[in-house]
Amino acid sequence: MSTFIVVFLLLTAILCHAEHAIDETARGCNRLNKKCNSDADCCRYGERCISTGVNYYCRPDFGP
């Protein structure tokens, strides 16, 4: 049973790392928390490309 858990966690870590590597080169952002490069990128309706201090992410836009 513990071997199954270790294998499952390893596969999860590999998949998460692979998705992160893909997001590094992504220009547009189609889902919440996906990296974007500026306000000109295409976040979903109701989201804006907002700086988190280091990177930009699509976040809900609550108004001006």
From Swiss-Prot:
Keywords: Calcium channel impairing toxin, Disulfide bond, Ion channel impairing toxin, Knottin, Neurotoxin, Potassium channel impairing toxin, Ryanodine-sensitive calcium-release channel impairing toxin, Secreted, Signal, Toxin
Signal peptide: 1-18
Tissue specificity remark: Expressed by the venom gland.
Subcellular location: Secreted
Disulfide bond residue pairs: C29-C43, C36-C49, C42-C58
UniProt domain comment: The presence of a 'disulfide through disulfide knot' structurally defines this protein as a knottin.
Function: Voltage-gated potassium channel (Kv) inhibitor. In addition it may increase intracellular calcium release through the activation of nuclear inositol 1,4,5-trisphosphate receptors (ITPR) of cardiomyocytes, thereby causing an increase in the contraction frequency of these cells.
Protein name according to UniProt: Neurotoxin lambda-MeuTx
Lineage: Eukaryota, Metazoa, Ecdysozoa, Arthropoda, Chelicerata
